[in-house]
Amino acid sequence: MLRFLSKNSVAAIRNVSIARGVHTKATLPPLPYAYNALEPALSETIMKLHHDKHHQTYVNNLNAAQEKLADPNLDLEGEVALQAAIKFNGGGHINHSLFWKILAPQKEGGGKPVTSGSLHKAITSKWGSLEDFQKEMNAALASIQGSGWAWLIVDKDGSLRITTTANQDTIVKSKPIIGIDAWEHAYYPQYENRKAEYFKAIWNVINWKEAESRYSNR
């Protein structure tokens, strides 16, 4: 996304975008499993709401903002006003697109660590055990005030760490390995105010094969 630039810079970048056909529209990725495949950890109802409604809204709003950004008559003030919408909705699209991949039905390995993998070894080396790592991730999730995400990321030096982001901010300069949604829409229709139960249950459907692949291909 564009930063705060001079009027001439904004115009130049927009002209390039227009010449290239503006932006490719974002699309809602299909879930790689059935809506009820993550039960009982995540109900069919909540998965339909989360994917079909919330994620779709991020996609729709991102596309709308991108279209407005391509308007050759847009002034600098209009450009700046659109940045927040692009950051928020683009972040929601990016974060959720990863989230669906990092989950898997139990019959397809969800919740089962790849104990022979390099990620598992790195986690146990740093946190002592997978259980201790999960406790720290859950503590990070619980510490989020309002809405946000907790992440296991790998930095450029290869080290793992846990971090959080607010709202739909994305991970930059590091690679996200596991991301867990702490927004109320991710759990409230099923768990209501018992979000600690959601934080515990979601580990039963974490796609460790995907996490291992992301770590190995960092």
From Swiss-Prot:
One of its GO terms (molecular function) is manganese ion binding. Its cofactor is Mn(2+). Its EC number is 1.15.1.1. Keywords: Antioxidant, Manganese, Metal-binding, Mitochondrion, Oxidoreductase, Phosphoprotein, Transit peptide. GO terms for cellular component: mitochondrial matrix; mitochondrion. Mn(2+) binds at residues 50, 96, 181, 185. The keyword Manganese applies. Binds 1 Mn(2+) ion per subunit. The modification Phosphoserine is found at residue 129. Induction: By high osmolarity and heat. Pfam families: Sod_Fe_C (PF02777), Sod_Fe_N (PF00081). Gene3D superfamilies: Fe,Mn superoxide dismutase (SOD) domain (1.10.287.990), Iron/manganese superoxide dismutase, C-terminal domain (3.55.40.20). Residues 1-21 form a transit peptide. It is found in: Mitochondrion matrix. It comes from the Eukaryota. It catalyses: 2 superoxide + 2 H(+) = H2O2 + O2. It is an enzyme of class 1 (oxidoreductase). GO terms for biological process: removal of superoxide radicals. Homodimer. Belongs to the iron/manganese superoxide dismutase family. Destroys superoxide anion radicals which are normally produced within the cells and which are toxic to biological systems. This is Superoxide dismutase [Mn], mitochondrial.
